[in-house]
Every structure is written in C-alpha cells, then in structure tokens.
Amino acid sequence: MAEGGAADLDIQRSDIATLLKTSLRKGDTWYLVDSRWFKQWKKYVGFDSWDKYQMGDQNVYPGPIDNSGLLRDGDAQSLKEHLIDELDYILLPTEGWNKLVSWYTLMEGQEPIARKVVEQGMFVKHCKVEVYLTELKLCENGNMNNVVTRRFSKADTIDTIEKEIRKIFNIPDEKETRLWNKYMSNTFEPLNKPDSTIQDAGLYQGQVLVIEQKNEDGTWPRGPSTPNVKNSNYCLPSYTAYKNYDYSEPGRNNEQPGLCGLSNLGNTCFMNSAFQCLSNTPPLTEYFLNDKYQEELNFDNPLGMRGEIAKSYAELIKQMWSGKYSYVTPRAFKTQVGRFAPQFSGYQQQDCQELLAFLLDGLHEDLNRIRKKPYIQLKDADGRPDKVVAEEAWENHLKRNDSIIVDIFHGLFKSTLVCPECAKISVTFDPFCYLTLPLPMKKERTLEVYLVRMDPLTKPMQYKVVVPKIGNILDLCTALSLLSGVPADKMIVTDIYNHRFHRIFAMDENLSSIMERDDIYVFEININRTEDTEHVIIPVCLREKFRHSSYTHHTGSSLFGQPFLMAVPRNNTEDKLYNLLLVRMCRYVKISTDTEDTEGSLHCCKDQNINGNGPNGIHEEGSPSEMETDEPDDESSQDQELPSENENSQSEDSVGGDNDSENGLCTEETCRGQLTGHKKRLFTFQFNNLGNTDINYIKDDTRHIRFDDRQLRLDERSFLALDWDPDLKKRYFDENAAEDFEKHESVEYKPPKKPFVKLKDCIELFTTKEKLGAEDPWYCPNCKEHQQATKKLDLWSLPPVLVVHLKRFSYSRYMRDKLDTLVDFPINDLDMSEFLINPNAGPCRYNLIAVSNHYGGMGGGHYTAFAKNKDDGKWYYFDDSSVSTASEDQIVSKAAYVLFYQRQDTFSGTGFFPLDRETKGASAATGIPLESDEDSNDNDNDIENENCMHTN
C-alpha cells in the first residue's frame, strides 16, 4: 500500500508520467492496466493539473491493481475481445508496472498481463505492443486427442515453442524430437527452422502443432521429410504438394471455377469475405487470369509494394478459379498483407471494408502504369463550368493514377463548400474508389440500470430502459419514471465502480458518456433539490478499517459494499445522523442474536417510520431550532472522524426494547421499534469534500452537526465514509443481502424489428448538405480563417463497378455501436440516373454481383459473402471454406455491409467491360459512353441513355 505524504505522490506522478512517454523497442515487455483503475489512481495522485482536489485522500485510494474488467470470466490471462488502447486499458513499460505493483500490489488471484513489443511493417518498420497473443494447440504425435492450449507472441521462435511443448509433455532432454504444423485432418508441415518466429512461419490463431519423438531404432513415426519444396519456407512430405497454399482433396478436377472457399486462419473471415467479393468481380478476375497484370507490374513505385501484393493476389485468384480445389488456405496472402499493412498482421477481427480499401489501393499502386508521377497544382473552379472543371480534374488524376483499378472502380464526385461568413463558394471534383453511404442513425439505445428506492427494505430493481441515442440524463430518468412510477425529478443517476461513486451525473449531461460496461445506479430522493433548503444530499461509502501493525496507531481502510445517496437534514445531531444511516441500511445489517450481546440489538432511532414523510422514506424527529451550530475546530484533521459514542451514554432518541427478528436482518417492525443502543456503535463517520473536512460540530454531549451549503457539493469527490471495524463488519453486515437485487420485466425486453430503409435513402443522405463540425473546419481562402462551412457532395460520373459501403459501425470516445438497420437494395436495375448531376453521364443502370455480410455486433461477429459466379450466372454463399448455392431472396438482409454493383453495359463480350483503355479517360470524365456497332442500333440503350440525362 502506498503511504506517505504529498511528496511521495509527487514522485509517483512524476515517475509514471515520465515512463508513459517511453519509446517502444522491439523485444521489450509492457503491461496492461485497466483504465478504470488507472483513472482512480490519477485522482489519488493528482495526475492531472485540473483534478487535484482529492490528491492524497485515502477515500479515493485506488487499492490493489484490478484488471478483472479486461479478462474473460474464469481465465486469468485471456483478454476480452476488441479492447481498445486508452479506452479500456493503459500500457505501461516494465519499470512503470513494477513501481505501481510495489506501491499498490496486484489484486489477489490475478496475474500480470505482460505483452511483448514486436516489429511490424515491410519497408517502414514500426514497433507495436502485441496485446493479443497467438493461441496455439499443442499435442503429441502418438496422442492427438490430448490437446493443450498455450499463447505465444508472434516474436517467439519455433525453438521456444518446441521447448514449451517438451516441458508440457515431460519429454526427456536426450530424446530427439521434431515439430509439425498440422492442417486439416492429414496434412502435416515440418517446422524445421528453430530461429524463425511465429510471424515468419505464418502460424495462425488456433493452429495445431504436433511434436514427434524419434523411435528407438532411429526412424521417425511420420517417415522422412523432403526439404526441397519450391516456394515454401518449410517443407512437406514428398507425397504432398505445397506451393504457399494448402488444398482440400488435391487432384479433384470437377469443381466449378470460382466456387472455392477460403480457410479461416483465425479471425480472418473479414479477409475471406472481401476476397470473395473481389474474386467475383468479372473485369478484375479476367485481368489476372489472362496474366495482363504481369506486363503492368510496377516494381519502382514508392507508394506501392514492389508488386508483391499484386503477385500474391494473382496466385490466389488462379488457384480459386482453377476448378481443382473446393477450398484453399490463403496463408501466404495473409502474410503478405500483414507485411505491408501491419494492422492486419495479427489475428484479431478486422473491418472487411478497411481491408478492401487497402487491397484496392495496394493493387492500384502495384499496377500503376504511371512510372513517374508529375507534380500537379490543384485548381479551384473559380466560376468555370462544371464540365470543364470535371474534365480537368479527371485528366490530372490520370496523369498520376492509371491502372486496372482506376479503369474499373474509380468515379468522380463534386464537392461544394460555402463559407458562412463571406459566402465564398469552393467547388472541386475528386475521384473516389467506393461510396461510403451513411445510414439513418439509430435514434434509440437500451441501457440497463438499477433503481434504489427510498424505502430501505426494498431491494434495488434492475430495469432496461429505452433512451434517445443522442440524449441526456434527464431522458434516462424520464424513461425510468414511466416504468417505475418514480418522478424523474426525484432521481439522481450515478456510475458505481469499485465500491465508490465513479460519477454523479447532472441532468443535462450527454448519455453518450455512459458506456455499455458501466454500472448505473439511480437513487430515489424525495426532496426538491432546488427548493428544499432544510436537507442536503450526501454520497455515503462503506469502509473497513484496519491497523498497519499491532504497535502503531496508524490505520488504513478499504472500501466494500455498495455506496448510496441519502438526503439528511441540514442541521442534525450525530446521534440522529447515525440512526438515519443505520435505518437506511437495515435491509442488510444483521440484528444481534448473540447471547453474549447483553446490551440488546442494534441502535436504531426512536419511532422511525419507514413509510414516513422524510426524504428517505423515514420520519425525522427533532426541530431545527434544537440543533445549534458552531465554528469549525481549528485542530480538525483533513479527514476528520466523528468519535464513537461513550460506552456509558445513550442516545437521547434511544430507549430499551427487544429484538424478535428471526432471520437476523432488520425488518420493518424492528426498524420502527424502540431499540436499545449498542455499547459500541457499528461504525464511525468521516466526511470528505474535495479533500476538506466539511462537518462542523460541537464536541459536547449534544454533538450538533451543520452541513454548510457554501462547502457541501453533490459530487463523487464529496462523501461520507462509514468506517467499520472488521469484527463488527463480519458480525453484523450481510454482504450477500447488500448485493441482492430484483429484476423488472423490462429486462427481458427485446427491441421491435426496425423498419427498413431503401438504398436510395442512403444515397440521398450522402448527397444532403451538411454543416462541418467544430473539430473539422474548412480553411476559407477569403477569410483566411477556419470556418464551419456547409458541404455538399454530388455524383458526377460512376465507374463500371460501383462499390457501396454501408456505414454500419460508429465510434465515439465513450461508445462503439453497430447499426443493424435493414437496407433494401435492388439486385437488378439499380438506376443511379437521378443522383448524377452530369447531364452526359451515360449508362447508369447496375446489377448486383457481390455482397459482404457482417453478422453480430461491435464486440465480435462473423463475415460471409454472397457472390454471382461470372461463368454460370448463379448466386453462391461463401462462408470461409464452405461454398453453397444461394437464392436471390436470401441476399437482402440487415447483415449486408459492402455491395458490389456492375454496370449493365459492361457485361457483354468476355466479361471484361467493353471500354477501350486509351479512351477511358475522356469517357469517365465526360460521362459519354463509347458506342459499338451493336450498341448504336440498340433502342433499349438509347432509351437508357436518355433516361440518364439530367433534367431540371
């Protein structure tokens, strides 16, 4: 436990602040600390200059480091999925962790969460703490049913793994062994490079490793291996073909080309889904299958990947479209992606659309036909016609970017910004590779809260309330009032963490500050907080006192139980305040049944009416005129204790009585009764308000108390602590009863199915004028200042393949959420003409060819894909290694995340769009389609082109 004065806390604050700035170095060890514990520590040491009110205050002492909030239940080392740095945890270097542990210790039963710093990136190296380890399954060759799971860092070597396996299975040091990587049911790959790391070897989450012991006669149970397999860092037995991908049922030749699944390497369904959508984009796949990419590989582009991504992509596409395999394992492709985009190098679930964006950009730069990009000065429209500015913007784009990706996926939109001060209009035309469409925001969210009633005998009740997504605390209280009948203005909303009030909310605070994992308690207080001048509301916490040693008078304390809010008379006596507190806790404070307790039962106040008219449901005795006040004691300490009652004295409100409680807990009758006083009170008081003592009383027999409104604040940093002696706590405090609660029927509430929105609604929302946020202003060249301008996006020209990203995921400082709105999108004949402002836009009808689906929420989920095979024209469902037929009525669902549309005029011929590359630039910029002899006589196309004309 940390002790000492402010100087010691200054050292703590300074040391940790310095160590938090430590640079990451490959191989170093860092430690995770739960952010909620760390925030409490920051309060205690006055870490932030604006929050030093409680510095050194034992009432906010953080206690032992508690990382339980980061861990899965029942697992001392397995982290919850999708934890976010700084939001959920803080990273500390070894020295910083050791200091914190020496000052505060670690919660009993917990282990340090240590993680290595690994190096990532192919050309630009950078270090990163590997928060999530790779879980491997280990077994012996002779007994593969006995599987042991262990977690390793990507920086760990094969030798490290083998030593761990030998240790697990008690293999003697003199016994010769070798290690195998087991795929599927009967495919094995020897891991014979002991210095290679897990990352180098391409081992993935859930991979099975088999250790094999040499026979006594010098032979190996699995036979000899052949270390000469081409294109592999590791070798396979000679009977197994291996070229970067592992196949199911080698030699099978009756598969429909393209109907090839992708094995899940461990949370890689996002990659599989994205790849299946691209694989079933006919123009792109034909380009790679016909080897056109080889003549356009750009090895010198500083923005590219030296052609590695394009070559790896091509190899995988060829395997999937060979018709030989029902599925392949894209291990080499995953490794290449991780080398150039370290964010995808691990085995955490990632965003499919983010990977698509990387792949499209990476393929573009690897295949960019421009070998030397010229510098181009961007120009504003300055009143010029849109057609002129659009053509100029597209030509400039092609001078630096010209690839198959541009040919297929790039379009042009118009951006208009208007300054609110000087009315300056800025018009630019910018290329896009995909459209990210906003969804109508979910207007509501559900929160689980606990309502604590005034009646002390009533258990807290858990409710599920529906509140506005963009609302405030008053909205929560209003919703809870409808369910409970408690007026909203009689509620106070709090966040309880680690036996203390983490936050006490004001009614106008935003609900976005409440996170999903917060424990929200709402207290009923029967006073008008703005008009009642006779009462004050105080937060009350429970503490267990203890001595540091038998020969010292220095004491410490630790919090326990649930804190509560309580309204008490502003002028009071110590006796009456004690009685009010005791009655407030009577549901879980035991009545003495010991025969040795000759003085009787607990000390409760006389004639206290549980259902009375007091602010806590308790009738209050005494006139304010009886309660005198006095100036504060100059000798009072910062955290002043109200002394225990003299053993020979008795409260003026206490008279003798009997206790007939059968279950050992206070009942309504016993609380109402006239109970005798204890020889010794169960607890004493300590009040703290922003580090100052705010209870003033006279040290005489009456012990009058006055709460000063100039000093008292309803704040999580101001509270009354009830200090319990350990023996009395153990004897009289029922912790199980204190934690008990009931569930309201609303907890079982399931939100009704939401009405669907049309894809066109999302496009309209995309093109709606909006005001820029204060955090994202526009620099006005006229005003020479950043302004919150209005911005409007319009579509000018569309590409042959239109990728539509439905923005389902939203992120904020306090919350992560997924919109599960059903978007109704057409499978055939998506007509985009009404959204194109270019009067010569050309063909603009699309058919759906692929969909990436995401099932689940922010905390996890699974990606799959629907795609239309370019050869047989049928729909299929791709779920990792599984491929099955699908019907069109399955495709539109609330799981749809990324849509791939192909323009109808590009389906003719070989499947590659009938646009000549040399003239593609002018066509895309102007929107005028190139006509073939066939098209020029096609009345349907004439009608379609006419329909695409902009009309006003």
Swiss-Prot record:
Keywords: Acetylation, Cytoplasm, Hydrolase, Mitochondrion, Nucleus, Phosphoprotein, Protease, Thiol protease, Ubl conjugation, Ubl conjugation pathway
Subcellular location: Cytoplasm; Nucleus; Mitochondrion
Ranges where the USP domain occurs: 260-904
Reaction equation(s) it catalyzes: Thiol-dependent hydrolysis of ester, thioester, amide, peptide and isopeptide bonds formed by the C-terminal Gly of ubiquitin (a 76-residue protein attached to proteins as an intracellular targeting signal)
Residues that bear Phosphoserine: S932, S936
E.C. number: 3.4.19.12
Record field: compositional bias (Acidic residues): 627-644, 931-945
Domain DUSP: 7-118
Biological processes annotated in GO: BMP signaling pathway; monoubiquitinated protein deubiquitination; negative regulation of antifungal innate immune response; negative regulation of transforming growth factor beta receptor signaling pathway; protein K27-linked deubiquitination; proteolysis; transcription elongation-coupled chromatin remodeling
Entries under InterPro entries matching the protein: DUSP-like_sf, Papain-like_cys_pep_sf, Pept_C19_DUSP, Peptidase_C19_UCH, RNA3'P_cycl/enolpyr_Trfase_a/b, Ub_carboxyl-term_hydrolase, Ub_USP-typ, Ubiquitin-like_domsf
Active site as annotated: C269, H862
Region (Mediates interaction with SART3): 2-223
Record's comment on post-translational modification: Phosphorylated. Phosphorylation protects against ubiquitination and subsequent degradation by the proteasome. Ubiquitinated, leading to degradation by the proteasome.
GO molecular function: cysteine-type deubiquitinase activity; cysteine-type endopeptidase activity
Alphabetized Pfam families for the sequence: DUSP, Ubiquitin_3, UCH, USP7_C2
Modified residue annotations for Phosphothreonine: T226, T573
Modification N-acetylalanine, positions: A2
UniProt-annotated stretches for the region Disordered: 598-666, 923-952
Main localization category: cytoplasm
A single GO cellular-component term on record: nucleus
Family: Belongs to the peptidase C19 family.
Subunit and partners: A homodimer structure has been reported; however it is unclear whether the protein form a homodimer in vivo. Identified in a complex with the COP9 signalosome complex (CSN). Interacts with SMAD1, SMAD2 and SMAD3; the interaction is direct. Forms a complex with SMURF2 and SMAD7. Interacts with TGFBR1. Interacts with SART3; the interaction is direct. May interact with RNF20 and RNF40. May interact with PRKN. Interacts with INCA1.
Function: Hydrolase that removes conjugated ubiquitin from target proteins and regulates various pathways such as the TGF-beta receptor signaling, NF-kappa-B and RNF41/NRDP1-PRKN pathways. Acts as a key regulator of TGF-beta receptor signaling pathway, but the precise mechanism is still unclear: according to a report, acts by promoting deubiquitination of monoubiquitinated R-SMADs (SMAD1, SMAD2 and/or SMAD3), thereby alleviating inhibition of R-SMADs and promoting activation of TGF-beta target genes.
Name assigned to this protein: Ubiquitin carboxyl-terminal hydrolase 15
UniProt organism field: Bos taurus (Bovine)
